[in-house]
Amino acid sequence: MVLIAALAALAACGGGDEETTSTTTSAESADTESTTTADASGCSEVEEVEVLAFAQHKDQEFVAADYETNPPAGGDHNPEPLQGGNFYAEPPRLGEAVHLLEHGAVIGWTNDLAPEEQEAIEEAFNEVFQEGYYQLAAVENPELEVPFALSAWGALQTCESAAPEAIAPFVEEWYASPKSSESALACDGTARRLPPC
């Protein structure tokens, strides 16, 4: 079941609530920062992930272990991006989803949500879509270690339950992420209405 919705990444469009920052180091020695941008129950602070502004195109099947975070927030990916503006009930190629992130998108990742939880996530994405954020996607990901997560190029937020209230603040902060060299594609005029990127 594929539904139109559209999710993408908005950091260039800016603005944020109170922020607290701390630096940590992952097992793979990548620096990350945690930034509070959403007050969603059951969700982590937004983690800023150190990524290159661009990555390599590789024609291979990617799995969660190929990336520093799960779900991915950047890295090498397939040559073709995932089609934004959709809900994917079946997992698409992970490398195509990561390529969409490079284009400034925000992706909501789900793992076996109850039908009413999935519907709430889709409704929240549709509300953001109606505000002009068209590079969005919701993707089923059985490799996800939590029920719900949001990612953009260089940013990740994980949730211990479905958290539709976390979507709008994350999109407002990370749509068209300034951490990607290709994020302007989220604001390139192909949509009918665009956020102020």
Regions found by a protein language model. Give the residues of each.
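N-terminal export and membrane-targeting signals
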Residues: M1-L3
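C-terminal motif of bacterial Sec signal peptides marking the signal peptidase cleavage site
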Residues: A8-A12
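Bacterial signal peptide processing site
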Residues: C13-D17
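Extracellular mucin-like PTS domains
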Residues: E19-A38
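Surface-exposed, low-hydrophobicity interaction/linker segments
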Residues: T37-V98, Q118
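Pocket-edge structural micro-motifs
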Residues: T69-P71, T110, E140, A152
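Mid-length scaffold segments of soluble, non-membrane domains
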Residues: Y88-G132
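Helix-rich interaction surfaces within compact, conserved domain-sized segments
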Residues: E127-C197
